Amino acid sequence: MTKLLLVAAGGALGSVARYLVGVQALRLFGSNWPYGTFIVNLTGGLLMGLLAAWLALRGGAQQEHWRVLLGVGVMGGFTTFSAFSLETALMIEKRAYAQAFTYTTASVILSVAAIFAGLLIARRIFSV
């Protein structure tokens, strides 16, 4: 139960942070490009890398709680792209280049395809 509460609390913080970055990006740069999402994804990747290294070096009994709160919760609420980026980086570090290429290519193409599928289904169901 503790882990669920950590995920929920972290997710709330991450989601609020994502929203605030999006609002600020819109205010600063306008709406002609998805600056907020781009900034969140790049920042999320950087923060996930810092977190992964910190957790690996830190160790200790509370390591799992920090991972759940910050990695799953905060970063999950902030951007799931950071988890995708970490998984890809780990594959590359293991020299699993084909796996990393397949994973990144399939993730991007199939995610965009899934969006179109969802749009199509919603339009048919709701006659939008």
UniProtKB/Swiss-Prot annotation:
Membrane topology: Multi-pass membrane protein
Family in the record: Belongs to the fluoride channel Fluc/FEX (TC 1.A.43) family.
Highest taxon of source: Bacteria
Species for this entry: Caulobacter sp. (strain K31)
Membrane spanning residue stretches: 4-24, 37-57, 72-92, 101-121
Residues annotated for Na(+) binding in this entry: 76, 79
Principal location listed in the UniProt entry: membrane
Protein name per the record: Fluoride-specific ion channel FluC
Keyword Ion transport: yes
GO CC annotations, alphabetized: plasma membrane
Subcellular location: Cell inner membrane
Catalytic activity: fluoride(in) = fluoride(out)
Keywords annotated in UniProt: Cell inner membrane, Cell membrane, Ion channel, Ion transport, Membrane, Metal-binding, Sodium, Transmembrane, Transmembrane helix, Transport
Pfam families, alphabetized: CRCB (PF02537)
Regulation of activity: Na(+) is not transported, but it plays an essential structural role and its presence is essential for fluoride channel function.
GO molecular function, a single term: fluoride channel activity
Gene Ontology terms describing biological process: cellular detoxification of fluoride
